[in-house]
A protein has these predicted regions:
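Acidic/histidine-rich catalytic cores of soluble enzymes
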Residues: 172-271
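Active-site acidic/histidine proton-transfer and metal-coordination neighborhood
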Residues: 11-13, 18-19, 94, 111-210, ...
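Alpha-helical scaffolding segments of alpha/beta enzyme cores, especially the outer helices
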Residues: 52, 56, 99-106, 130-138, ...
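Hydrophobic faces of well-ordered beta-strands that scaffold small-molecule active sites
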Residues: 33-38, 65-67, 115-120, 144-146, ...
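N-terminal pre-domain/capping segments
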Residues: 2-143, 311-320
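Acidic-and-aromatic substrate-binding clefts and catalytic sites of carbohydrate-active enzymes
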Residues: 42-48, 69-77, 92-98, 121-128, ...
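C-terminal/domain-terminus segments
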Residues: 292-315
Length: 320
């Protein structure tokens, strides 16, 4: 029979252990486990040796891959746009880099990698949803993502854009994938007292349109990303993670690629800049972000830069 003294000792021990167990579980929950990489960070490497680059990314510790288009099945207008811009970029490879979706899937599987999302152009979303979704299903990708959209002259233009996105999203659902919009800092300046990006979020069906937040470009657009994460819970499902060497803003409305290029020198590896990443990523988890994807656009020192960002992400512990 247990004495009163032993009972109290056992009870006290059990009570003391509860917070320790809880803290252990919380520590695990606050980690970002499967960090991804947007391949636009290292376009020349994947163009030169796709399989070898996937092996390198896996060895570094990345778990998820995000592709950028166009693809062999993409709409001609998207291919023509890509052909027009690549000479200034110094590379031309995109999509699956000459491989089929099945071949890519095999390479990813061999390296323990997955591909939750594919970036693609607007015309492909409107005209080639069938083959796009088919490739997504082969890879196991859930999201097809529009990386940017045209700036509109007025709120009526943004209303029409929102309605178009809603229709694209409904078509994506019919094909078994989900549509997301990466606004690239566009639509954040108020027009007649209304922020176009907020109009798009609120005018679209949450089942038809999700969002990919790029914390650098959204900050450059002058908004508080934490406020948006808290306000629109469940809408941001993917996030591009990078840092800002110093606090900078677009020279205009953020809708012009030239404005993006102006800020490239201020991109830096996660954890080495001025953004409060622990705060942002903690709110992102609570908001419903599923995939945290490192992006260092055209990384100057690819392997070094990607290692640095991943090390920071893996060591990060997020607040409650």
């Amino acid at each position: 029979m247990t004495s009163r003294r032993n009972f109290l000792k056992q009870t006290a021990g059990a009570i003391a252990a509860v917070p320790l167990i809880g803290m252990s579980d919380l520590d695990t929950a606050r980690k970002i486990r499967n960090v991804g990489i947007q391949l636009f960070s290292i376009p020349k490497l994947v163009e030169q040796d796709f399989a070898g680059t996937m092996k390198m990314l896996a060895e570094i510790g990345y778990k998820e891959i995000e592709f950028y288009g166009p693809y062999s099945f993409s709409a001609e207008q998207d291919k023509e746009f890509w052909d027009a811009v690549t000479p200034s970029l110094g590379f031309s490879g995109s999509g699956f880099f000459g491989l089929t979706a099945k071949e890519v899937k095999t390479i990813l599987d061999d390296n323990g990698l997955s591909a939750p999302s594919l970036h693609t152009g607007l015309f492909s979303l409107k005209e080639a949803m069938g083959p796009l979704a088919e490739a997504a299903h082969v890879l196991g990708s859930k999201y097809v993502v529009l990386p940017s959209a045209a700036t509109q002259p007025d709120l009526d233009g943004y209303k029409a854009q929102a309605d178009e996105f809603n229709a694209i999203g409904a078509e994506a659902v019919r094909h078994g994938v989900r549509f997301a919009y990466h606004n690239h800092g566009n639509g954040l300046k108020p027009i007649d007292g209304t922020v176009p990006f907020e109009l798009i979020v609120e005018r679209t069906d949450p089942k038809n349109l999700y969002f990919q937040m790029d914390i650098f470009w959204m900050t450059a657009g002058g908004v508080d990303v934490v406020t948006y994460l808290d306000r629109y819970k469940g809408r941001f499902r993917l996030m591009h993670v990078k840092d800002m060497a110093k606090d900078v803003r677009f020279s205009g409305d953020g809708g012009d690629p030239n404005q993006w290029m102006e800020l490239f020198p201020h991109l830096t590896n996660a954890g080495s800049g001025v953004l409060d990443l622990p705060e942002i990523l903690s709110h992102a988890q609570k908001s419903g972000v599923e995939h945290f994807i490192v992006e260092r656009d055209l990384a100057p020192e690819p392997e070094k830069d990607l290692r640095a960002s991943l090390t920071y992400m893996k060591e990060l512990r997020l607040g409650r």
